[in-house]
Regions:
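N-terminal Rossmann-like FAD-binding beta1-loop-alpha1 element of flavoenzymes
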Residues: 5-32, 351
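Short loop/edge segments at beta-strand edges and connector loops
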Residues: 11, 82, 190-194
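Glycine-rich FAD pyrophosphate-binding loop
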Residues: 24-49
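Dinucleotide-binding Rossmann-like beta1-alpha1 core, especially the glycine-rich loop
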Residues: 49-116
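Active-site/ligand-binding neighborhood in enzyme catalytic cores
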Residues: 87-206, 210-217
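Mid-domain catalytic core of redox enzymes
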Residues: 194, 198-321
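Short FAD-binding loop at a beta-strand-to-alpha-helix junction that anchors the flavin cofactor
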Residues: 319-336, 343-346
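An active-site-proximal "capping" alpha-helix that borders the catalytic cofactor pocket
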Residues: 341-353
């Protein structure tokens, strides 16, 4: 397929939109292909009754990377939202992350995590980690990759801020506007409802691909394992449902992992998100991924690492025989569990060709 473009970007999420903008600002003509009907990837939102509803679960921007912070602020301003997460266990509410506040609430005495004995640590693990992790990943926590458990935050302070990063917030005009502005450039053409298949079309320009790497090669070596999510969203006819943006339900007997209440992401309540009518809540249900589902979290195992290596070798073979390189990235293309700022950073670091 001949094109009049200097590059094609497949996927209009964080990584793809950032790549497209960088290419456009160097003077290249860029075609962005997005298989969904709208841009924004899993940050896509919809305004319902004056509330910015995150369609694919809560997305909070936070970073300590000054380059990333400077880049995103070219396209939007952020509010001063600081993320806090509550946990519900046996009909009581606790403040995450694990720190002095939660220990005081759970044990009824002043403690630091470093002062816990084995019995206390086991009780804490069973209450707040075991059930939630089992639901999220579909296996006991002992079988989860250690890097996942390492993401859990532990503090020797009373702070209940979930993130430590100095820069945090939600775009004042919403995530959709951030992505619209990223792609608002005369050198960028966007086609939604249009994916990219390597085996179906050959392009005479570089391709930057952020879809699933196994799908790119028609699952030649088999499917990489993912966890998927299902969301149930409802309007509740009262001003506040749970008093927080996110409440984790840590017991395995509760089928969902958490409830999101999106009105709390805009405490400034001005502009498009002023005076919401009632509130919107979403329950999040993890599930095993199968073809046709949305892939969310890569499952890191020795087997998946070996399978990923086979697909990466296919990319290398393709590039060795093609004058137009294929560059993969993003959560799906790299098969990595990225925070949003890390996906921006990865896209900013890609050498452009």
């Amino acid at each position: 397929m001949n094109t009049s473009y200097d590059a094609v970007v497949a996927g209009a999420g964080v990584w793809g939109c950032t790549i497209a903008r960088r290419l456009a600002e160097t003077g290249r003509k860029v075609l962005v292909l997005e298989k969904r009907k709208a841009i924004g990837g899993n940050c896509r939102c919809r305004t319902i009754d004056g509330i910015e509803v995150h369609l694919y679960g809560s997305h909070i921007f936070h970073t300590s990377d000054e380059e990333v912070w400077k880049f995103v602020n070219r396209f939007c301003s952020f509010n001063d939202y600081r993320h806090q997460v509550l946990a519900r266990y046996k009909d009581r509410i606790y403040h995450l992350p694990i720190g002095c506040t939660l220990l005081k609430e759970f044990f009824g005495r002043d403690l630091k995590p470093s002062e816990l004995d084995d019995a206390d640590r086991n009780a804490l693990f069973d209450a707040f980690i075991r059930g939630y992790t089992s639901k999220q990943w579909g296996v006991p926590p002992e079988k989860v990759d250690p890097s996942i458990i390492a993401r859990l935050k532990v503090r020797d302070t009373f702070s209940t801020d979930y993130f430590d990063d100095p820069h945090q917030g939600i775009p004042l005009e919403g995530y959709n506007e951030l992505f619209r502005r990223l792609l608002d450039h005369p050198n960028i053409t966007v086609r939604c409802g249009r994916g990219y298949r390597l085996t179906a079309e050959k392009l005479d320009c570089p391709v930057y691909y952020s879809g699933p790497i196994d799908q790119l090669f028609d699952y030649r070596f088999g499917e990489l394992p993912w966890r998927s999510l299902r969301f149930e969203t409802e309007h509740v006819a009262r001003r506040d449902f749970q008093g927080a943006t996110v409440v984790n339900y840590t017991e395995v007997s509760v089928p969902f992992t958490r409830i999101h209440e999106f009105r709390h992401y805009h405490p400034e309540a001005k502009g498009a998100f002023a005076k919401p009518k009632g509130t919107i809540v979403t329950r999040e249900y993890p599930s095993d991924w199968k073809k046709g589902d949305e892939p969310y979290y890569p499952i890191a195992t020795p087997e998946s690492a070996a399978l990923l290596a086979k697909y990466q070798e296919e990319v290398a073979r393709f590039n060795a025989g093609s004058p137009h390189p294929l560059i993969l990235g993003g959560r799906l293309g790299a098969y990595k569990y990225y925070d949003m700022d890390k996906s921006f950073a990865a896209a900013l670091a890609v050498p452009l060709v």
